[in-house]
Amino acid sequence: MKKILAICGIELSLIFKKPQNYLIMFAAPLLLTFVFGSMLSGNDDKVRLAIVDQDDTILSQHYIRQLKAHDDMYVFENMSESKASEKLKQKKIAGIIVISRSFQTQLEKGKHPELIFRHGPELSEAPMVKQYAESALATLNIQVTAAKTASQTAGENWKAAYKTVFAKKHEDIVPAVTRQTLSDKKEGAEASDTASRAAGFSILFVMLTMMGAAGTILEARKNGVWSRLLTASVSRAEIGAGYVLSFFVIGWIQFGILLLSTHWLFGINWGNPAAVIVLVSLFLLTVVGIGLMIAANVRTPEQQLAFGNLFVIATCMVSGMYWPIDIEPKFMQSIAEFLPQKWAMSGLTEIIANGARVTDILGICGILLAFAAITFAAGLKALRA
């Protein structure tokens, strides 16, 4: 054990003796948290959109409520088409979503109604707005199909089944009573934009740091450090354990300091400490495993850093570390289901927003444990080869 701790201590000293590492480990994530958190926070920074409901039916009204239910980035306002067009000309709104007169009829026939989205050329967020609107429409389409199936089984009109099952969810009084009766948690709450970006950028930069740290295995092999350790009666298992422990400790030091810093600087409450410790520990084990896998398949520390950074940055984008995952296309959200960052982010959101404890995130912890087991096994096997 002393030999393992000695190797771990050496690796820690190598990481923290370089001043530039402090910038990438602490300064960069805190700065980006401040910038992105400020950009995404507050109504004044949200995209203001008008909704023109030409159909004025149960489903069109329910669709509007769905759009307004998740307004982290957008502010929706119902108005007439003439008023909306005038406001768009005056640039008082960024765009107009028009719900056509055949909206409910098309949904009843199992078809996908066409959404009309008008906006000015200066709206850079137009693709994201359209994707958000289409995503909400796809959800509504699924709900209508489910209500029609249920109505056939129960022998009642599909509208009655739909009102009973889905429309009631959006009545103000029902969620309030349910939450107070069943639990003292804020069911369905979402973390603030600053808290979400703090979690996302902490995950991103911890992964970047650990990818670079994993490259020290290659450097140690190249410089003959492993050979000298083996001749000094240190086993391969002890060497490997020392490096793995150092990566894990480095990750926790960085994550821990970021947690405390964001709490002091931005007032973020990270929730239940035990849940955070368990979740972050499992995620760090997964990242160590990924680092070992990449290190085993490249030849130089430079290649490790290049491939590692490319993997981390790309997968963090898909997993919603930079922005809310809800605004991404469906196929990207499906890909994110197979990435550990997405599950770590989901767990942290549950802890921060809903006050989740360890028992509440056992499913997420189980998924991260599976990720860790697979990546560790693959990485260690490749290193031995």
From Swiss-Prot:
<keyword id="KW-0812">Transmembrane</keyword>
<dbReference type="Pfam" id="PF12698">
    <property type="entry name" value="ABC2_membrane_3"/>
</dbReference>
<keyword id="KW-1003">Cell membrane</keyword>
<dbReference type="InterPro" id="IPR047817">
    <property type="entry name" value="ABC2_TM_bact-type"/>
</dbReference>
<dbReference type="GO" id="GO:0005886">
    <property type="term" value="C:plasma membrane"/>
</dbReference>
<protein>
    <recommendedName>
        <fullName>Linearmycin resistance permease protein LnrN</fullName>
    </recommendedName>
</protein>
<dbReference type="InterPro" id="IPR013525">
    <property type="entry name" value="ABC2_TM"/>
</dbReference>
<feature type="domain" description="ABC transmembrane type-2">
    <location>
        <begin position="163"/>
        <end position="382"/>
    </location>
</feature>
<feature type="transmembrane region" description="Helical">
    <location>
        <begin position="360"/>
        <end position="380"/>
    </location>
</feature>
<feature type="transmembrane region" description="Helical">
    <location>
        <begin position="239"/>
        <end position="259"/>
    </location>
</feature>
<keyword id="KW-1133">Transmembrane helix</keyword>
<feature type="transmembrane region" description="Helical">
    <location>
        <begin position="198"/>
        <end position="218"/>
    </location>
</feature>
<dbReference type="InterPro" id="IPR051449">
    <property type="entry name" value="ABC-2_transporter_component"/>
</dbReference>
<comment type="subunit">
    <text>The complex is composed of two ATP-binding proteins (LnrL) and two transmembrane proteins (LnrM and LnrN).</text>
</comment>
<keyword id="KW-0472">Membrane</keyword>
<feature type="transmembrane region" description="Helical">
    <location>
        <begin position="274"/>
        <end position="294"/>
    </location>
</feature>
<keyword id="KW-0813">Transport</keyword>
<comment type="function">
    <text>Required for resistance to linearmycins, a family of antibiotic-specialized metabolites produced by some streptomycetes. Part of the ABC transporter complex LnrLMN that probably facilitates linearmycin removal from the membrane. Responsible for the translocation of the substrate across the membrane. Also mediates KinC-dependent biofilm morphology.</text>
</comment>
<feature type="transmembrane region" description="Helical">
    <location>
        <begin position="305"/>
        <end position="325"/>
    </location>
</feature>
<feature type="transmembrane region" description="Helical">
    <location>
        <begin position="22"/>
        <end position="42"/>
    </location>
</feature>
<dbReference type="GO" id="GO:0140359">
    <property type="term" value="F:ABC-type transporter activity"/>
</dbReference>
<comment type="similarity">
    <text>Belongs to the ABC-2 integral membrane protein family.</text>
</comment>
